UniProtKB/Swiss-Prot annotation:
InterPro entries the UniProt entry points to: ARM-type_fold, TRPC4AP
Function as written in the Swiss-Prot or TrEMBL entry: Substrate-recognition component of a DCX (DDB1-CUL4-X-box) E3 ubiquitin-protein ligase complex required for cell cycle control. The DCX(TRPC4AP) complex specifically mediates the polyubiquitination and subsequent degradation of MYC as part of the DesCEND (destruction via C-end degrons) pathway. The DesCEND (destruction via C-end degrons) pathway recognizes a C-degron located at the extreme C terminus of target proteins, leading to their ubiquitination and degradation.
Subcellular location: Cytoplasm, Perinuclear region
Tissue: Widely expressed, with high levels in heart, liver and testis.
Record protein name field: Short transient receptor potential channel 4-associated protein
Gene Ontology process terms (BP): hair follicle maturation; protein ubiquitination; ubiquitin-dependent protein catabolic process; ubiquitin-dependent protein catabolic process via the C-end degron rule pathway
N-acetylalanine: residues bearing it: A2
N-terminal signal peptide: none
Taxonomic source organism: Mus musculus
A cellular-component GO term for this protein: Cul4A-RING E3 ubiquitin ligase complex
Gene this protein is translated from: Trpc4ap
Chain segments carrying region Interaction with TNFRSF1A: 2-400
Pathway(s) it belongs to: Protein modification; protein ubiquitination
Length: 797
């Protein structure tokens, strides 16, 4: 009788197990309901409660269910993996199980990447999905992190081969199963730990690619100073590893973009800057500083960026060979693996197992003998292109960061610019046919093509390098620098100090400097080319800052002005981005330069051409206002000069005559103020506000400011909306004070580009915002009382 309670307890326990089993099989002991287990596992994955792992089922149960659901035996394999991967395991059997799991997932991943849906449709549920649902991802994370656990003072170890298998399986699961990458990204300790796996060459490629994918979806940017022994880790990378590492760095040193257009407004940016000042440096800034503190880091990047590729393979065979391999180029890791097969024959059996095609021919992939025979110079060139675009991106971001001057000095010292000049024709802007390779799933004009991306990244780097920095003259060679000096001497003006201070040992060598090479390809670029925008931006950055007559003449002598006018007028360019970049460049090229206006008038030599030009200007003032500003400033200077050459240009130039008319200036002024509002101001359109201020500052110099304000008031009334324009302008000027009085760089740029002291800018704004309604130069004097709305709060918290 004493045993009865125990028996009853045992029966109750057995009943609970049966009930649980019945629930798992669909709530009763009969035939299982399809999908019910997977649903419960999915709920458990989301909540952390209930069914979450294969170990919660018996092997018999899983085997029976597998017959119906076709799970490829993955849950049973996971059950064995749990049993053989405990802390005291020797991991021998564990590794053999991983070898069984890997091909089940890798074939699926290959089908996913190559968009071969036929393979995945054969199973009810993808293998990667089943693997994750039964707890495979979490288990592999635990296995990989075993070395962080100590038992009796000794840290556990797992082999590189086993780590490699785990990483490949994780990567394939991330590729095929939605949400896995994000879950891994939330495990910050795991993400940091992954960096330590890059110390081994055997696991480097798999680790780097997995980290890259994880960081791409991580909500908060990782801090590199939390990576153990970062300096030692990076310093020990060989050049190939460092180039791969740049793919990761691209994510860690760039400020995160919210993707919300509203966040790009200057109001939001100013609010964010105030917040950042209280919080200290951003994670991206901390990461940049961490990298720059690593000895030799920038020097090694410069060497990578300028490393040459053997030219033993001709262009035609290069393209033909690449077309046979295009499906592999979607994934940089696959490309690295192929390179490894080609270059390290002795290691071909250890090629990364992200996809089985890199394994044996029996698995339906490339036989090693075929890979070694067919992986030619073409793949090496593409490999180098993909490396260089990542390296150039990192250098570009560092050039725009807080340590800009430090990076500039190092880039100059390590001869990045002359090195890129030597690569320009053979790699960066090499000739290729219309059948050039594009990535799988893209077209020839897609900016994702490695060739195209490299060109754009190269142009962005030149833009960042030249922008408002004296080192821009390193883009020239010695002969071209001498030409600048000769231009100054002939014009009887002082030679540019930065030219005199340029270290001639660091400039470009050869017959042409990098700037001249860029001009040559720019003039040959097809009308519809997307490169036109970036080329114009790069050349314009060379002219930015204090206006240099010698710099302008250097470019004018090479036919740049005629090329720009051809694109604007004769080709009737339709792209707004390209038009804006060409108008900006034209403005910098012509500003204060009498010779440029003479050339302009010679090219635009008919009323018909001039009307086409005006139509392009007036079609979008956001795009053309910088040119309007430069012409207005030039007109003001020319009118105050006593020179026959200047007088001749003033009397003959259609453009100067057009801008000199007060109705023209008022039309521009009215539209410039009307197309912007405080809430919509961005870095792109704030120039409209500054151009309107330039027009009014020049009017103030001539004591005509009240006249211009009175004319604006009349134009308001003619539109039947009294007060709407001047109220808006008042708010814009209030914002201007908040924005520019706290940004030294912006104020310096305004001063240098206009040759008007910033104190005069500030005075003019203060006069316009004067609250005294009796002041003839105050905006409020021209807003009637019933329509006044000047105290609106436009700040964003």
């Amino acid at each position: 009788m004493a045993a009865a309670p125990a028996a009853a307890g045992a029966g109750a326990s057995r009943g609970r197990r049966l009930a649980a089993t019945a629930a798992a099989w669909g709530g009763w002991g009969g035939r299982p309901r399809p999908g019910n287990i997977l649903l419960q596992l999915r709920q458990g994955q989301l909540t952390g409660r209930g069914l979450v792992r294969a170990v919660q089922f018996t092997e018999t149960f899983l085997t029976e269910r597998d017959k119906l659901s076709k799970w490829s035996g993955i849950p049973q394999l996971l059950l064995k993996l749990y049993a053989t991967s405990h802390l005291h395991s020797d991991f021998v059997e564990c590794q053999s199980i991983l070898k069984e799991i890997s091909p089940l997932l890798s074939m699926e991943a290959m089908a996913f990447v190559t968009e071969d849906r036929k393979f995945t449709q054969e199973a009810t549920y993808p293998n990667t999905y089943i693997f994750d649902l039964f707890g495979g991802v979490d288990l592999l994370v635990e296995i990989l992190m075993r070395p962080t656990i100590s038992i009796r003072g000794q840290k556990l170890k797992i082999s590189d081969e086993m780590s490699k298998d785990c990483l490949s399986i994780l990567y394939n699961t991330c590729v095929c199963t939605e949400g896995v990458t994000k879950r891994l990204a939330e495990k910050n300790d795991f993400v940091i730990f992954l960096f330590t796996l890059m110390t081994s060459k055997k696991t480097f490629l798999q680790t780097a690619t997995l980290i890259e994918d994880i960081l791409g979806v991580k909500k908060e940017m990782i801090r590199l100073d939390e990576v153990p022994n970062l300096s030692s880790l990076v310093s020990n990378f060989d050049q190939q590893q460092l180039a791969n590492f740049c793919r990761i760095l691209a994510v860690t040193i760039s400020e995160m973009d919210t993707g919300n257009d509203d966040k790009h407004t200057l109001l939001a940016k100013n609010a964010q800057q105030k917040k950042s000042l209280s919080l200290g440096p951003s994670a991206a800034e901390i990461n940049q500083a961490a990298l720059l503190s690593i000895p030799g880091f920038v020097e090694r990047l410069c060497k990578l960026a300028t490393r040459k590729v053997s030219e033993s393979t001709g262009t035609a065979s290069f393209l033909q060979e690449l077309e046979e391999w295009y499906t592999w180029l979607d994934n940089a890791l696959v490309l690295d693996a192929l390179m490894r097969v080609a270059n390290e024959e002795s290691e071909h059996n250890q090629a990364p197992t992200v996809f089985p095609s890199l394994g044996t021919s029996e698995e339906g992939g490339l036989p090693h003998t075929s890979a070694r025979a067919q992986l030619p110079q073409s793949m090496k060139i593409m490999h180098e292109i993909m490396y260089k675009l990542e390296v150039l991106y990192v250098l570009c971001v560092l050039l725009m960061g807080r340590q800009r001057n430090q990076v500039h000095r190092m880039i100059a010292e390590f001869k990045l610019i002359p090195g890129l000049n030597n690569l320009f024709d053979k790699l960066i802007w090499r000739k290729h046919s219309a059948s050039a390779l594009v990535l799988h799933g893209h077209n020839q004009n897609c900016d994702c093509s490695p060739d195209i991306t490299l060109k754009i990244q190269f142009l962005r780097l030149l833009q960042s390098f030249s922008d408002h920095h004296e080192n821009k003259y390193l883009l020239l060679n010695n002969q071209e620098l001498n030409e600048l000096s000769a231009i100054s001497l002939k014009a009887n003006i002082p030679e540019v100090e930065a030219v005199l201070n340029t270290d001639r040992s660091l400039v470009c060598d050869g017959k042409r400097g990098l700037l001249t090479r860029l001009l040559q390809v720019m003039k040959k670029e097809p009308a519809e080319s997307s490169f036109r925008f970036w080329q114009a931006r790069a050349v314009e950055s060379f002219l930015r800052g204090t206006t240099s007559y010698a710099d302008q003449m250097f470019l004018l002598k090479r036919g740049l002005l005629e090329h720009i006018l051809y694109c604007i007028v004769d080709s009737e360019c339709k792209s707004r981005d390209v038009l804006q970049s060409y108008f900006d460049l034209l403005g910098e090229l012509m500003k204060f330069n009498v010779d440029a206006f003479k050339r302009f008038n010679k090219y635009i030599n008919t009323d018909a051409k001039f009307q086409v030009f005006l139509k392009q200007i007036n079609s979008s003032l956001v795009d053309s206002n910088m040119l309007v500003r430069c012409v207005t400033l030039s007109l003001d200077r020319f009118e105050n000069q006593v020179d026959m050459k200047v007088a001749e240009v003033l009397s003959e130039c259609r453009l100067l005559a057009y801008i000199s008319q007060v109705p023209t200036q008022m039309s521009f002024l009215f539209r410039l103020i009307n197309i912007i509002h405080v809430q919509t101001l961005t870095q792109e359109n704030v120039s409209c506000l500054n151009t309107s201020l330039v027009i009014l500052m020049l009017a103030r110099r001539k004591e005509r400011l009240p006249l211009y304000l009175r004319l604006l008031q009349r134009m308001e009334h003619s539109k039947k909306y009294p007060g709407f324009l001047l109220n808006n302008f008042h708010n814009l000027l209030r914002f201007w004070q908040q924005h520019y009085l706290h940004k030294d760089k912006d104020s310096t740029c305004l001063e240098n580009s206009s040759c008007i002291s910033f104190s005069y800018w500030k005075e003019t704004v203060s006069i316009l915002l004067n609250p005294d309604r009796q002041s003839p130069s105050a905006l409020v004097s021209y807003i009637e009382e019933p329509y006044m709305d000047i105290d609106r709060d436009f700040t964003e918290e």
